[in-house]
């Protein structure tokens, strides 16, 4: 028995090379020549064990997770909403921001956590597209999913229900676009910002003041202040619609952004692929201990790899973005950035090569912020005269052009050069209060720009309640019975945010919803004053874009949940038992 085992072990452990040589020698003896091809080694990867749930079990587990997360987020909705304490790293945070709460929640049960992850997705998508309305989107999604699953459990076709939901939401979005009215002046801007900041009038006033200074095409930046006061300052700057080439350049992982202060700026229309072209420049900026921002046509291959590796090792403090625009417009935009930063544009058609660039030819940016899809450059005041001269030149070109496209692009460039950046410096007595205020101001800023973009509608969930009155007409156009069920689900879900706002204010939600339904489009419930009034006139307004994105994203994720029949999650590993204390020791 032992010899058999020894033989089998030998045959298994024999190296592939020896086996190949033996086979080769046999074939050479038989035929005189052979084409040798070695078989590749094969690796087997064993996946972790999974738990699988089907049908009602999977749906109920997901629903439980969705409810837990939506309940926590829903507490913050409305002017009478509560705060939530997040105990993460360092001191606990007191927040009133839906997406921040959603991102912080991880449930211990993996199946419930899968449901919670879907609501996190709704909140994140709404935050990315509109910048606000994350709580409303989460509540809408929970309600559509809950009502939809009840119908699916009763035997309705989930695919048809999803189609009905999608068709109804698409029709409601068209109605919303017709009903939204454009922003009229600073009072509307102040009202939108105040509501989004949790009815903080001071923040609303500051946002309105900042936009008044930089205009609707300007940029608002939020920073921490060294004092207890919150102030607004306007600084020269420009926003570019290009983000970092590689996420490895990120300096602030929490926000996934690059932040530089007193950075040198290289501006060129050339493609950089060989590291030897920029090594002299990297050495000089490293000696100056200054960060380096590279704006070029592209950075690829060896150059990009070297920059990333040295950035990760802490040797270089560098980031790179692609040049904005295309063709001749790209050169014009790069010249704008060069004038803003005081750099010399390294243009290939002028024979100015990157490898010959000196420190004196680099620009200087007091602050640079780069996200995945945009870059904000705040320049030094030294280039102000040249900047004004450039703006005057662009205005002259604008007056002479007949092209609508060119006039739009020139107006955009003038706004970016002359508007500058309004910096809101946030102050607070404690770190916890500072974080909360910054989140509120961020929401207010995003909501304000969303309102300028697509107009405003009555707030407090009122617009959604009134939209529910348009559903019966949409439903009549649907022929399939299950699709009509989808329309009914949307109609019932639309009243949930208004009902929850009233509930958080201590009022019966259903009563409030019925009174809103019987009123005009702009009339609704003001939870702050506990009255029914014209919300637009009293300043309780929401951006139409926020309402639209909340509804679309909620319906999108809800449709995916309703058409889900099984969940596959990783099986939790059993925790190791605590070792017993050795005998004779006192614990």
UniProtKB/Swiss-Prot annotation:
Bias (Polar residues) ranges: 1-25
Disulfide bridge partners, by residue number: none
Pfam families: Cpn60_TCP1 (PF00118)
Listed PROSITE patterns: CHAPERONINS_CPN60
Keywords: ATP-binding, Chaperone, Chloroplast, Nucleotide-binding, Plastid, Transit peptide
Presequence boundaries: 1-47
Highest taxon above the source species: Eukaryota
GO cellular component, one term: chloroplast
Keyword Chloroplast tagged: yes
Gene Ontology molecular function terms on file: ATP binding; ATP-dependent protein folding chaperone
Subcellular location field: Plastid, Chloroplast
Chain segments carrying region Disordered: 1-33
Keyword presence, Plastid: yes
GO annotation terms (biological process): protein refolding
Function: This protein binds RuBisCO small and large subunits and is implicated in the assembly of the enzyme oligomer.
Similarity remark: Belongs to the chaperonin (HSP60) family.
Subunit: Oligomer of probably six alpha and six beta subunits.
Further information: This protein shows ATPase activity.
Annotated protein name in UniProt: RuBisCO large subunit-binding protein subunit alpha, chloroplastic
């Amino acid at each position: 028995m032992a010899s058999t085992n020894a033989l089998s072990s030998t045959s298994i452990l024999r190296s592939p090379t020896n086996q190949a040589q033996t086979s080769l020698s046999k074939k050479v003896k038989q035929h005189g020549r052979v084409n040798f091809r070695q078989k590749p080694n094969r690796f087997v990867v064993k996946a972790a064990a999974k738990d699988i749930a089907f049908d009602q079990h999977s749906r109920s587990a997901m629903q439980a997770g969705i409810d837990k997360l939506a309940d926590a987020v829903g507490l913050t909705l409305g002017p009478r909403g509560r705060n939530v304490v997040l105990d993460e790293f360092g001191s606990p945070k007191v927040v009133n921001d839906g997406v921040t709460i959603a991102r912080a929640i991880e449930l211990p049960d993996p199946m419930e956590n899968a449901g919670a992850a879907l609501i996190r997705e709704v909140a994140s998508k709404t935050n990315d597209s509109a910048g606000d309305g994350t709580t409303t989107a989460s509540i809408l999604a929970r309600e559509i999913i809950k009502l939809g699953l009840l119908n699916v459990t009763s035997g309705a076709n989930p695919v048809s229900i999803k189609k009905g939901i999608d068709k109804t939401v698409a029709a409601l979005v068209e109605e919303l676009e017709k009903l939204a009215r454009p922003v009229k002046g600073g009072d509307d801007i102040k009202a939108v910002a105040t509501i989004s900041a949790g009815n903080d009038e001071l923040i609303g006033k500051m946002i309105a003041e900042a936009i008044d200074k930089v205009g609707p095409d300007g940029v608002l930046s939020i920073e921490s202040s060294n004092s207890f006061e919150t102030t607004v300052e306007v600084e020269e700057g420009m926003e570019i619609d290009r983000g970092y080439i590689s996420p490895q350049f990120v300096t602030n992982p929490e926000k996934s952004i690059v932040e530089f202060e007193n950075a040198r700026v290289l501006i060129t229309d050339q493609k950089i692929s060989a590291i030897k072209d920029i090594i002299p420049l990297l050495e000089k900026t490293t000696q100056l201990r200054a960060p380096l921002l590279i704006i070029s046509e592209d950075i690829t291959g060896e150059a990009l790899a070297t920059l990333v590796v040295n950035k990760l090792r802490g040797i270089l403090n560098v980031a790179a973005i692609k040049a904005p625009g295309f063709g001749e417009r790209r050169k014009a935009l790069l010249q704008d950035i060069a004038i803003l930063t005081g750099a010399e544009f390294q243009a290939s058609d002028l024979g100015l090569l990157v490898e010959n660039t000196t420190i004196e030819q680099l620009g200087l940016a007091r602050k640079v912020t780069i996200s995945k899809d945009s870059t904000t450059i705040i320049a030094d005041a030294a280039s102000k005269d040249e900047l004004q001269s450039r703006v005057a030149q662009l205005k002259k070109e604008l007056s002479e052009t007949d092209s609508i496209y060119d006039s739009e692009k020139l107006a955009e460039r003038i706004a970016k050069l002359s508007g500058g950046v309004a910096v809101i410096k946030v102050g607070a007595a404690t770190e916890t209060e500072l974080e909360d205020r910054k989140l509120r101001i961020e929401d207010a800023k995003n909501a304000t720009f969303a309102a300028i973009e697509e107009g405003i509608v009555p707030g407090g969930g009122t617009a959604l309640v009134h939209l529910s009155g348009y559903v019966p007409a949409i439903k009549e156009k649907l022929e399939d019975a299950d699709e009509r069920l989808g329309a009914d689900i949307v109609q019932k879900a639309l009243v949930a945010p208004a009902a929850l706002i009233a509930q958080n204010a201590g009022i019966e939600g259903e009563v409030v919803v019925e009174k809103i339904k019987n009123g005009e489009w702009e009339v609704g419930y003001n939870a702050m004053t506990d009255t029914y009034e014209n919300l637009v006139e009293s300043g309780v307004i929401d951006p139409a874009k926020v309402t639209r994105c909340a509804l679309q994203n909620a319906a999108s994720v809800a449709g995916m949940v309703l058409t889900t029949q099984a969940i596959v999650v990783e099986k939790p590993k059993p925790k190791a038992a605590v070792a017993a204390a050795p005998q004779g020791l006192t614990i």
